[in-house]
Amino acid sequence: MAIFKKPAIKAAAGKKREIPRGVFQKCPGCGQVVPEMELGQNQRVCPRCDYHQGQPAIERIQSLLDPDTFVEMDADLRSVDVLRFQGMATYTDRLKKYHESTGLLDAVVTGHGILDGYKVAIAVMDFGFLAATMGSVVGEKITRTIEYGTTQRCAVIIVAASGGARLYEGMLSLMQMAKTSGALARHGEEKLPYISVLTNPTTAGVMASFASLGDVIIAEPKSMIGFAGPRVIKETTHQDLPERFQTAEFLEEHGLVDMIVHRKKLRDEISRLLSYFAATR
């Protein structure tokens, strides 16, 4: 029998302290908790494992273009609930919810600006808005951006991230695949460059249209890129899928992606490509 007994230490009663929202982020790559400020300063790349997290469209544009040169276009376009879609929440309610959380009216920010001295038309998709699905507004804004680049005879840059076509708009969303692709075909006929940047994830209707039509296709490291998901493909083909299937690295090895570029080096790489295109025109 013990002579001395160590008293049990009990935690002080009270409510569990909660970490204020938006102060820290848990990295999907390594599981480490990273301060939000540190992530923002590092272009949303995890400083622990180099995982490329989703980057808001405005932040992406600021990291690519020369300071104070971006001019936004078609900022007032917004989607309409033409199908009067009903579900757990109406389409109108969902649009309102994502507008409040992101400050955007839809899933893409478009405009024109200067990148290292080169005039460009640019469209950047924001996965934070309804998984950056492509509806009538997204397709229209991207098409207008391409047409602006064609008219102004400058390069077009599209940074894609998407879960595909927007089911809330039915056939109207699928029509955007043909519309954006047609605009790019006319842009190409004018011998003008189009650079496509694929980020995590880029899938379905977006990948099956404008995202895969770049003169140069760049992907961020370890991005998921494909049409249907691995589970759907496996169930359809009844075959085991290759290791690293639908990753940027796998697609680069098989010639579907031209290069993989770290986010911090993306501006310099695009500038190099633009200088090449300018020299060959």
Predicted regions and their residues:
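Cleft-lining beta-strand/loop regions that shape enzyme active-site pockets
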Residues: 106-188, 195
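Long, charge-rich boundary regions
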Residues: 55-132
